């Protein structure tokens, strides 16, 4: 966990022209001691550098994708999943739009489309995904990337119905975000 990078990122922070940190001096290279023997140098790679580069590539694209949380159903689960999803997607520099909750999938999709969302994340409980996920996918009709927050027991059924995107604690955050950037036409 990299606090402020892949956990609790600042949703509104911009790089303001900063570039990814490059390896400098001899760190990571080869150095010799006074007797001309090779000395192993320290690697100065920063753990956050790949996340920073991803966020910068999103910024440089000139497009700041909007990720809309379609929160519905069980209050505790939808809030927890929305918080997780906001943190997950903000790592790539996406604008995240959280919501208190919707009475129906149709209402949530309508609001997502009004907001011009590029990504819509369904946030609910595992038990409710069987009821809400497929109608949400159909209502979106490919007008945004559709994601289910979590790894519900009905995941195989949802995949069979055409739902491809799931984010959860076992996902590789960096690889998943790179995949979404690619789908959004954002180059590395």
What are these regions (language model features)?
Residues 109-117, 136-137, 180-184:
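Short low-complexity, flexible loop/linker segments enriched in glycine and/or proline
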Residues 105, 128-137, 176:
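Active-site-adjacent beta->alpha loops and helix N-cap segments on the catalytic face
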Residues 74-79, 128-131, 154-156:
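Flexible loop/turn segments at secondary-structure boundaries
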Residues 83, 106, 134, 152-156:
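Residue-level marker for well-ordered alpha-helical positions
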Residues 58-71, 134-146, 181:
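Long, low-complexity, intrinsically disordered polar/charged segments
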Residues 124-125, 151:
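Active-site-proximal beta-strand/loop segments in catalytic clefts of secreted hydrolases
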Residues 1-124:
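Non-catalytic terminal/interface segments that mediate subunit docking, oligomerization
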Residues 138-188:
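Peripheral docking tails and interdomain loops at the edges
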